[in-house]
Amino acid sequence: MACSTSCSHAGATFTRTIASAMPASNMASQNWEDFNYPPLLNLWHYAPHELEQGPRFVARTLHAALLLAMLALVCNLLVNIGVVVAGFSHAIHIMYAFFNLLLATLIGMWTTMECGYKGMATNKPKLMRRYLWVWGLLTLAMAAASLLALINFNGWGRVASLLATPADPTVQTFWVVGSVIESSVWTLACVVSTVAWTMIFRANRDGPAALRWYAGSRR
């Protein structure tokens, strides 16, 4: 039995080593000194078209998760501005929403581009593990924002609370509609982020060979 276990472990290690070596040259061929993302700021290199089909699909999924999270934060800011202007909330919530957008965008971009995208494209487990930790926590935060009425976040709990509490019809309609939109975007961001997290988890666990599955799924 010990021999069988040892052989199995050796076989798995050999398979991962070979799989890692095969596509590594293609994925690492990008010019990482060509900083082109985000537009105008140019802090990171992002060129999914330079990757093979499987890694390209993963890269775009990671990017979609980032953009959806940013869109949810923009929705949160706009809803808070409307509610504050209507006199149903304190102006400080606008400041909270703005700083949430700024801070989360910076953390999200760094995590996605420097850790997830670069780690996957160059097959560096350290970067991918960093992405898994940080983006995993951010995904949990997105789930909370989509479900609860936390401080100035308008999740599905806010929708239920507003519908159960009589208020000025005009303001309530705006707040309910805004909360439904914000909650929906948070929910979608959470789902796509979970998919992106799973992709990087598989790439970190199984090596570049795991990315070929996504190429096959796109045919």
Question: What is the role of each PLM region?
Answer:
Residues 1-54:
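Extended, low-complexity, polar regulatory segments
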